[in-house]
Amino acid sequence: MSHDGPKTIRVAAVQAEPEWNNLQKGVEKTIRLIIEAGKNGANVMGFPEVWIPGYPWSIWNQSVVDNVEFMDEYFRNSLERDSEEMNRIRCAVKEAGIFCVLGYSERYQGSLYISQSFIDENGDIVHHRRKIKPTHVERGFWGEGQADSLKSVVKSSFGNIGGLNCWEHTQTLLRYYEYAQNVDIHIASWPLIFGACAEMQYHISSEMCGKLTQVMSMEGACFTLICSQVMSAENCERNKVDKWSFVKAPGGGFSMIYGPAGEPLVEAPDAGEEVILYADVKLAEKWRAKQNLDVVGHYSRPDLLSLKVTNNAASQVHFA
């Protein structure tokens, strides 16, 4: 599509509580939110990281051994990309007529991956990527994405849609490669992250993670949607975090929408509020921002600094 005209696109960022470790209820809630966004005129919609079946914060405060039963349940309630459950979600996206980036814990054979599926308004999965490096203790439970997951932007009827998961936003080269793919609207899929406190380092706070994503809007001259989860007080015990002072419930949400100069486009919701944030955006505003800052164009020095990217995905099995 042409980005030069006055066409307005409505974007939608989810902030909601998952149906913890319950695949079927998680699919049902996902469908409800998609239909709601469609009825409210959304064109592009983003969901949090591992929205289905929710982010397991217990992996940060309990040992792998202590989490065996919990994570077994988590595995069984993770979503397969090629499944009846995904087909139901795809049908809802088609009914709503939107472009959706769905974050979920992907179950593939015997492994889990932190994944995003890009679903167009026809209900087709036009791209699928996995977090290339799960963060810290996450590596005990989720596998890594390969070179095909470096592609993070796809063309759509509503502009070029990109997406990254959580601390992938700290991967400077990965961000840069997304800018080089000419992203217009970026879906920043985050889990629930709580406010700054003495128990955790500041870089694992909603304040810092929000700032990091805001910088991506400015740096990439793109519209950015922070999509995050929340946790209610009654679900703390269910998630094995009821005795952890770092967890403030209800809370964990920090969803937001930013413009291509890094400006906030909506009022930030309360950290414990379930809401879909909406903003009407004009993609042509990107070019105004690019006049000043185009880090993959006029404000770059490829003769001095450049990025090397592989596009050959590694495989466990090779045929002679």
Curated annotation (Swiss-Prot):
Pfam families: CN_hydrolase. PROSITE patterns: CN_HYDROLASE, NITRIL_CHT_1, NITRIL_CHT_2. It catalyses: a nitrile + 2 H2O = a carboxylate + NH4(+). Residues 9-283 form the CN hydrolase domain. InterPro entries: C-N_Hydrolase, C-N_Hydrolase_sf, Nitrilase/CN_hydratase_CS, Nitrilases_CHs. The lineage of its organism: Eukaryota, Fungi, Dikarya, Ascomycota, Pezizomycotina. The active site is at 49 (proton acceptor), 131, 166 (nucleophile). The keyword Hydrolase applies. This is Aromatic nitrilase. SUPFAM superfamilies: Carbon-nitrogen hydrolase. One of its GO terms (molecular function) is hydro-lyase activity. It is an enzyme of class 3 (hydrolase). Its EC number is 3.5.5.1. Belongs to the carbon-nitrogen hydrolase superfamily. Nitrilase family. Keywords: Hydrolase. Nitrilase that hydrolyzes preferentially benzonitrile and 4-cyanopyridine. Also acts on dinitriles like phenylenediacetonitriles (PDAs) 1,2-PDA, 1,3-PDA, and 1,4-PDA, and cyanophenyl acetonitriles (CPAs) 2-CPA and 4-CPA, but with lower activities. The keyword Acetylation does not apply. It comes from Aspergillus kawachii (strain NBRC 4308) (White koji mold). It comes from the Eukaryota.
